Amino acid sequence: MAQVINTNSLSLLTQNNLNKSQSALGTAIERLSSGLRINSAKDDAAGQAIANRFTANIKGLTQASRNANDGISIAQTTEGALNEINNNLQRVRELAVQSANSTNSQSDLDSIQAEITQRLNEIDRVSGQTQFNGVKVLAQDNTLTIQVGANDGETIDIDLKQINSQTLGLDTLNVQKKYDVSDTAVAASYSDSKQNIAVPDKTAITAKIGAATSGGAGIKADISFKDGKYYATVSGYDDAADTDKNGTYEVTVAADTGAVTFATTPTVVDLPTDAKAVSKVQQNDTEIAATNAKAALKAAGVADAEADTATLVKMSYTDNNGKVIDGGFAFKTSGGYYAASVDKSGAASLKVTSYVDATTGTEKTAANKLGGADGKTEVVTIDGKTYNASKAAGHNFKAQPELAEAAATTTENPLQKIDAALAQVDALRSDLGAVQNRFNSAITNLGNTVNNLSSARSRIEDSDYATEVSNMSRAQILQQAGTSVLAQANQVPQNVLSLLR
């Protein structure tokens, strides 16, 4: 080897090795201090990508486990409410068994019915007020989707059902032998709704029946329902030769076409006249199919096509025992109340009566208006409830309709109805119990998956302290040795001085 001064190759070689050992020492210290083998992508590019995917799955599955626990909580909340409803139903059944005994006086039956009513009202309260995090669990049919996985579509559904006295078929449960009908009407109350629709003005709409005589133009027929049959009370027939045509006619509905025809002669029938007043008219939250309602009103003989504001409302009455009896739906306008119906999809439509015009022979439709002239009796049945238009307690029915509970008879087979209600509650409780077990199984599986994924990720990105401590010790020794050797390598050029002496 040549003896040179300008270039100290041994020193450069030693410095290079010293830098390597220093880098190795830094890596070992970083891994020991962080606990991670991969602190950046340069440590292991492929391993970093794999570990990152594992982290996403682990975090998602951990949250999914919490979601499943929330699902258990909402199922338990619902089941707790159903348990209380079941307790009330058991008491109602006990009272129904007691009422079936002929030794009971009317006073005894009234007391039994009063408690039954209170129990049913409590069922309705539990149904309407039980909620979990703002979700009313028994107020309506609803499906809750619980995310129990880290990816799309990994869900479990909780099917909730509306459970109240009406859906249980017990809203008209009556074990009394009589039903008191009040002679005094109670004023209806209504709060304006923000959910309005545009429909034509419907003042003075009635079902008109044409006739071949001069008196036919003024004929009006008021539609009613009793014992499974429709009747039309005809008035306004002013032909002197045919005044006996005023009266009540049976109405027949054709099975194939749905057309309505009237009997040729009046019949004697006692239509419901006793009425209790509507005590509540509430806004219905259902979205209204305004276009369909408007078209139906026009087809029903609406005279004025100018737009008017109407609101879909639902009427109800609270009887002497405190039982809320639901009425039907109606459109409330400035002209009064008009019979309406709401299907399962939430669409509202006008209820109409079909009839055949005796003059033209054509089939027509007429809207059922809940109301009429002051003092005039006009009865319309909506969804099994009878509304009476007669003037009562000095109020005008045009503004405030009355609810006549004509079917105030003792419920047939009350125990059978209550048993069916209990079975309905039991079915929902069974579903909730099954879904809770399913959630528990999902949570166990999620826990196992998280553990296995965490172990797999650990093997990729966590530091092996035995290895890293060994690497650090080796690097430290190399650093010390390198430093010592570098000092000696730097002295090698001084050997040239001996040649210059």
Swiss-Prot record:
Protease found in the keyword field: no
Entry-linked Gene3D superfamilies: 6.10.280.190, f41 fragment of flagellin, C-terminal domain (2.30.220.10), f41 fragment of flagellin, middle domain (2.170.280.10), f41 fragment of flagellin, N-terminal domain (1.20.1330.10), Flagellar export chaperone, C-terminal domain (6.10.10.10)
Top-rank lineage group of the source organism: Bacteria
Protein's UniProt keywords contain Disulfide bond: no
Molecular function in Gene Ontology: structural molecule activity
Family: Belongs to the bacterial flagellin family.
Note: Individual Salmonella serotypes usually alternate between the production of 2 antigenic forms of flagella, termed phase 1 and phase 2, each specified by separate structural genes.
Protein name according to UniProt: Flagellin
Organism listed in the record: Salmonella choleraesuis (strain SC-B67)
